[in-house]
Amino acid sequence: MLDPLVPTAVYKAPDFTEGQKFHPGEGPHTTNGKTTQISDIVIKAGGEDRDKPSDAKDTQLGQLRAKLTTLQDQLNIFLTKRMDHEKSRSQEEKDLERQVLDEGVDDDSD
């Protein structure tokens, strides 16, 4: 039987000619997301995840919940990589600007 409850997402931005599509895939799926847990720093300091979700029930809605967690992980990873790329690109532009200002413009028009 085909599962009718399969979430999908499409990320659109002006710099994307086509939207970035996300699909949870075949699994396995869990409600314990990779990107929605408390940070490793907090865990190492003895912190506890008090908001940890319950396991998904073996029902259509339970499986949908787990697939949504997978989809959320995919989106979070994609957006984090995108932000890191933008940050490094911005830093490269700042470095280039600083280099031009420090060295001046080479004007050979004399």
Swiss-Prot record:
Compositional bias of kind Basic and acidic residues: 82-101
Principal subcellular localisation of the protein: nucleus
A Pfam family that the UniProt record links to this protein: Gon7
Span list, region Disordered: 16-37, 82-110
GO biological process: tRNA processing
Cellular location(s): Nucleus; Chromosome, Telomere
A GO cellular-component term linked to this record: chromosome, telomeric region
Keywords for this protein: Activator, Chromosome, Nucleus, Telomere, Transcription, Transcription regulation, tRNA processing
Subunit structure: Component of the EKC/KEOPS complex composed of at least BUD32, CGI121, GON7, KAE1 and PCC1; the whole complex dimerizes.
UniProt family annotation: Belongs to the GON7 family.
Role, per record: Component of the EKC/KEOPS complex that is required for the formation of a threonylcarbamoyl group on adenosine at position 37 (t(6)A37) in tRNAs that read codons beginning with adenine. The complex is probably involved in the transfer of the threonylcarbamoyl moiety of threonylcarbamoyl-AMP (TC-AMP) to the N6 group of A37. GON7 likely plays a supporting role to the catalytic subunit KAE1 in the complex. The EKC/KEOPS complex also promotes both telomere uncapping and telomere elongation. The complex is required for efficient recruitment of transcriptional coactivators.
Protein's UniProt name: EKC/KEOPS complex subunit GON7
Source organism of this protein record: Debaryomyces hansenii (strain ATCC 36239 / CBS 767 / BCRC 21394 / JCM 1990 / NBRC 0083 / IGC 2968) (Yeast)
